[in-house]
Amino acid sequence: MSIFKRAKKTVLIPPPHLLSGDEERVTILSAEGEIKVTGRRPTTLEEKIYYSMNLAAAIVGGDLHPSFKSMTYLFQKEMEFGSTQEKVNFGSRKPAPQTTYQVTKAREVYLQTQPLEKKIPMQTYSVSTEGATITFTGRFLFSSSHVGCDDNRTKLAGLDGFTTSNSYQRVKDYYAQETALALTFAAPEKRGKEK
């Protein structure tokens, strides 16, 4: 009889929506910092999603990055449920309300065929949209991990529910239309007098 006890190995069965060939890999996105909204404060869920989309696109360079949805979900959750602090910035010419959301070790996950191992140092990202300036000051950590670790499957299910929700779909369509309009915008041509 051995005096050493062998630890039991837990075999995790991935849920059906993960069985796409890359179920063994998942990337964790950890964020830490604060979101400042100067100007128009987001009050509805749709506004919070829209602000989050703009901020996520500014950070990862567009909505095609694999972590765009995950980052949008993360920021939206912090705006919806995180701790908030409001004040008026009297240092500017036009005193504008300033809302701060604390992002303390928030985590989301997303699937990727080739997981990144990337740590981004503390940086400031800022974007202006519809009467407000949204600024995130903080750091990110993208790290690969097994799909069963740290309750990632529950988080993926939450992300899946968020991206299929009616609110997200409405804002996504509006955001896509607005982005397309911004990309196709052309300056009006100057026309001379016709003889």
Swiss-Prot record:
Family: Belongs to the novirhabdovirus matrix protein family.
Gene Ontology cellular component list: host cell cytoplasm; virion component
Function: The M protein has a crucial role in virus assembly and interacts with the RNP complex as well as with the viral membrane.
Record's subunit section: Homomultimer.
Main location: virion
InterPro entries per the UniProt record, alphabetical: Rhabdo_matrix
Domain of life: Viruses
Subcellular location per the Swiss-Prot or TrEMBL entry: Virion; Host cytoplasm
One of the record's GO molecular function terms: structural constituent of virion
Keyword Chaperone: no
Keyword Membrane among UniProt keywords: no
Pfam annotation, one family: Rhabdo_matrix
Protein name, per record: Matrix protein
UniProt keyword list: Host cytoplasm, Viral matrix protein, Virion
